From Swiss-Prot:
This is Protein SLFN14. GO terms for biological process: cellular response to magnesium ion; cellular response to manganese ion; mRNA catabolic process; platelet maturation; rRNA catabolic process. Keywords: Endonuclease, Hydrolase, Nuclease, Nucleus. Expressed in spleen. SUPFAM superfamilies: P-loop containing nucleoside triphosphate hydrolases. One of its GO terms (cellular component) is cytoplasm. C-terminally truncated SLFN14 endoribonuclease: Requires manganese and magnesium for its endoribonuclease activity. Its EC number is 3.1.-.-.
């Protein structure tokens, strides 16, 4: 089949109400029913798919004859909120195709992560053993899990509860206990108690008593064990309460006890506790006499309350495993119901390194923690990058499209022709959508393009240069299927979704001739702008879990939005804290936050730009700030040299690297923002803002900074909860800060280094850091470093990155001469012409090549950190390099010292 779906071929099936009524083979009818409903259940739990049923009756028409009442009833039991939400039907010649949407629970119910026919988890309800529905099973599992987590001891009885509430139940229970103490019974003796929550009577009149006992015992044991325990009394009539027993000719007592023991010990259990005890039960055989002669036996099974949960058998719940409909085991079922991670050490999962995302059985994997934060911004991100207009289709991302269209003549026209007449949506390009979502790339593929438009299902175009570039036959199919799965799981798209794969050739300007048309039911077409936007928001989440140019562009915008939120929160301190020392750890984007505060000061105090002063150490940062925000910006040296009578508010950045050589800048700043009264009684001195931003881990010199001692830096605000970079980069910074705490550098202050705490920083990484890249190479010559940088840059340009995304930084100004010429020579061998700019031209189009000090306060998506010394002699520079990178960090070291 041409569908990019998990497909179940059922073989021949009798369909239609009249045809199924006429079936004389009841076993075959039940088999067809169960096979079909199990396949539906498996696909529901495995991301959806297609069931292909070969129609037995060649005159059958789905439109005229329908499915058959027994099949419809089974689907209704499986999907009580309405099977039409998940199932669609389409007849193709002599095949009926059932399109199954991925399982999504009813919004008003508990969040059931999987669908089940029966839980086979029983509880006692007065005189009945109830096979719990999915909601009831989930409630019981959560209750037992919570009790185990609290360390509540296992209760062997609940006398203290029953005595207060249901005395009758306790009386019956005590009668059953007394009954158990008897040695013999009389035939047709009437018992003084009845069935209850704790007592079940059973009488079997069949010839084969032992098989019937084994048949029914499991669900009664499960029910009593999962409730409060109880007694199964076999050989007593449940209506008359008379003792009949099991005739001695039909039952061997010892054999019966063995069968019961084997049956109970085989029952599947799931433990939340550490002790993991077995089901505790007692079996007693009572002799029944008729006129002093042995007539038979009554069997009593006493079941104790169980600490966790006991199942009668594995749940009737199914998944697709290796394209086979497979029944879930208890362990799998409980873990999926409760969203329990099998491997809690997985850390920071991404698409590219999470192989479990490929497993259909785990079609709803745990989302990475950072997506929780992204969910708050997905709509804004979608509108920023994928704005859906009624004009022409938009091709995104722009940088990659520009590269592709300039390198391959006719590609843009080919895609416009293929996507016609769609005009209300987006076409999203990638060098390899397969690589983006964790599959193997195909070298012969020129690019992939995903159409998301009103009036069309999703279509994935794979563009090859010509028919001879066949590549792997299953490339497009697998990519389309995996993309669909991740839009459902990571993207959380709730609607019916398909991705139709198509291969097209650039040379012939057309599709592959052997591709059959692919049809889906109408609900799989995106019918409105709202549906397109919902799906694009899901695509935002999927992209942010990958590593691609689109992911990086989305990630940088996401960090900007988080930074804006953080600035809004921090600005609430403006009124109450006119002076504030803000300690920011690496990765928290200190300078960007300081710049945001300038805008907030203008908004809060309604002051003019000329009344706000931004003070920093370097000319390059000063120039950058002046391009970002409207205010006065000066270096510390200029601040000490000039007077600023009109300034009311001062924001100072990088104060950890200020110095007092030109005077006491702190005293001057304080006297500027908090001038003393001139003696007039009716004059009130102005109290402006003086906020000082510093990073205690990035002190670059041993001279005194001029800051007050740490104990005098009050009031103080710690910025540690937001990490605005890739998780791989954040890990480098975390390790360096930990190392510096353990071995403080000569210019650091142990008191301020103590602000770093590993656990909260890791929590911030999990909550906000996105996937990225960090590579470290050592023992390289300058030429090897230059070649590595050039190859990596041209590879990135091929993927759609731009020169202005990149900064190449070295440790000291004097290192520039060592690297510039070899870098220019190496870069000249590539196809993209690039220019190197200094940090002073950070807003120009070109690669930044400058010292890490001159680039202070600024960031780039991609940073190369060059160090001629060995990795062990680099001091705090690894931290400085890392703090300048957002998504990619490449640390390249010379020297001969190995790791």
């Amino acid at each position: 089949m041409p569908y990019a779906e998990i497909t179940v071929n059922l073989g021949k099936v009798t369909l239609g109400e009249e045809n199924r009524k006429k079936m004389t083979n009841s076993c075959l009818k039940r088999h067809e029913n169960s096979s079909l409903v199990q396949a539906v259940c498996a696909l529901l739990n495995s991301g959806g798919g297609v069931i292909k049923a070969e129609i037995n009756d060649k005159s059958y028409s789905y439109r005229c004859h329908g499915l058959g009442q027994d099949l419809e009833t089974s689907f209704q039991k499986l999907l009580p909120s309405g099977s039409q939400k998940h199932l669609d039907y389409m007849q193709q010649n002599h095949d009926l195709l059932i399109f199954v949407k991925s399982w999504s629970p009813d919004a008003s119910s508990l969040p059931l992560r999987i669908c089940s026919l029966r839980s086979n988890l029983y509880q006692r309800d007065v005189t009945s053993a109830i096979n719990l529905c999915a909601n009831g099973a989930l409630e019981l599992l959560r209750e037992k899990e919570s009790r185990a987590q609290r360390g509540t001891p296992r209760l062997h009885s609940q006398d203290h509860i029953l005595n207060r509430t249901i005395q009758e139940e306790e009386d019956i229970k005590m009668c059953a206990l007394e009954f158990l103490k008897k040695d013999k019974l009389n035939f047709k003796e009437k018992l003084s108690f009845t069935e209850s929550t704790h007592v079940e009577f059973k009488r079997f009149t069949t010839k084969k008593i032992v098989p019937r006992i084994k048949e029914t015992l499991a669900h009664y044991v499960s029910a009593f064990a999962n409730t409060q325990g109880g007694y199964i009394i076999i050989g007593v009539d449940d209506k008359s309460k008379e003792v009949f027993g099991c005739k001695k000719e039909k039952v061997n007592p010892d054999s019966l006890k063995t069968e019961i023991k084997n049956c109970i010990e085989k029952l599947p259990t799931y433990h939340f506790c550490r002790e993991k005890p077995k089901v505790n039960f007692t079996t007693k055989i009572l002799k029944v006499y008729q006129k002093e002669a042995l007539y038979g036996f009554v069997c009593v099974v006493q079941v104790e309350p169980f600490c966790c949960v006991v199942f009668a058998e594995d749940p009737d719940s199914w998944i697709m495993e290796n394209n086979i409909v497979t029944r879930l085991k208890v362990q799998q079922w409980v873990e999926m119901m409760l969203d329990i991670q099998s491997d809690p050490s997985s850390g920071f999962p991404t698409i590219n390194d999470s192989a479990h995302l490929m497993t259909p059985a785990l079609s709803a994997p745990r989302r990475p923690a950072y997506l929780t934060k992204v969910l708050e911004h997905k709509e804004t991100l979608q509108r920023h990058f994928f704005s859906v207009t009624q004009e022409n289709l938009q091709f995104q991302p722009e940088s990659l499209c520009k590269k592709l269209f300039s390198d391959h003549e006719g590609l843009e026209d080919l895609l416009k022709a293929q996507t016609h007449p769609c005009s209300h949506g987006i076409v999203i390009f990638s060098r390899s959508w397969a690589g983006d979502i964790g599959l193997m790339r195909e070298e012969k593929v020129l690019c992939d393009a995903l159409l998301v438009a009103v009036g069309s299902p999703l279509v994935l175009y794979t563009i090859l240069t010509d028919p001879s570039s066949t590549g792997r036959a299953d490339y497009t199919q697998n990519t389309a299927l995996q993309l669909k799965r991740q839009l459902q799981t990571l993207g959380g798209y709730p609607g019916k979704i398909c991705v139709i794969p198509r291969v097209i050739y650039l040379a012939s300007r057309g599709s592959r001739p052997d591709q059959p048309p692919v049809y889906y039911p109408r609900p799989y077409t995106l019918s409105s702008k709202a549906e397109v936007e919902d799906l694009l928001q899901g695509l935002v989440l999927v992209s942010l879990c990958s590593r691609s140019v689109l992911s990086d562009q989305l990630g940088c915008e996401f960090f900007k939005q988080c930074l804006e939120e953080q600035a809004n929160t921090l600005s609430r301190n403006l009124q109450e804290s006119r002076e504030l020392f803000i300690h920011c750890l690496p990765g928290t984007r200190k300078t960007a936050l300081a710049i945001k505060m300038v805008e907030k000061i203008k908004d809060v105090f309604h002051c003019k730009p000329k009344e706000i002063l931004f003070v920093c150490e370097n000319d390059s940062l000063r120039d950058f700030v002046m391009q970002q925000v409207t205010c006065r910006a000066v270096t510390r040296r200029t601040f000490m040299r000039e007077e600023f009578p009109k300034i009311k508010h001062i924001v100072m950045d990088e104060t950890e690297n200020f110095c007092s050589r030109h005077g006491d800048w702190y005293v001057k700043a304080k006297s500027t923002t908090h001038p003393k009264a001139n003696g007039a009684a009716n004059e009130h001195p102005h109290h402006g803002i003086l906020w000082l931003f510093l990073d205690p881990f990035q002190v670059r010199h041993a001279d005194g900074s001029g800051l007050p001692v740490p104990s005098a830096q009050f009031p103080r605000k710690m910025i540690t909860s937001e990490i605005h970079c890739a998780v791989e980069i954040a890990k480098v910074m975390k390790d360096e800060m930990k190392r510096m705490q353990e071995n403080p550098p000569s210019m650091g202050l142990p008191d301020t280094l103590a602000t770093f705490q590993e656990a909260p920083y890791e929590e911030a990484m999990r909550a906000g850091a996105l996937p990225g890249v960090c590579e470290i190479k050592a023992n390289l010559t300058p030429e090897q470093i230059a070649n590595y940088v050039a190859e990596k840059c041209h590879s990135l340009f091929h993927e759609g990155y731009l020169p202005q995304d990149i900064a190449i930084l070295y440790r000291r100004r004097e290192d520039r001469g060592q690297y510039k010429d070899v870098l220019l020579k190496a870069m000249a061998r590539g196809t993209t012409e690039v220019a190197f700019n200094s940090a002073a031209d950070v807003c120009a189009d070109g690669i930044i090549l400058d010292s890490v000090e001159q680039f202070s306060g600024m960031v780039r998506n991609i940073v190369f950190g060059l160090c001629p010394e060995s990795v062990h002699s680099e001091g705090v520079h690894k931290l400085c390099f890392a703090s300048k990178a957002i998504k990619h960090l490449y640390l390249l070291y010379g020297g001969r010292t190995a790791f």
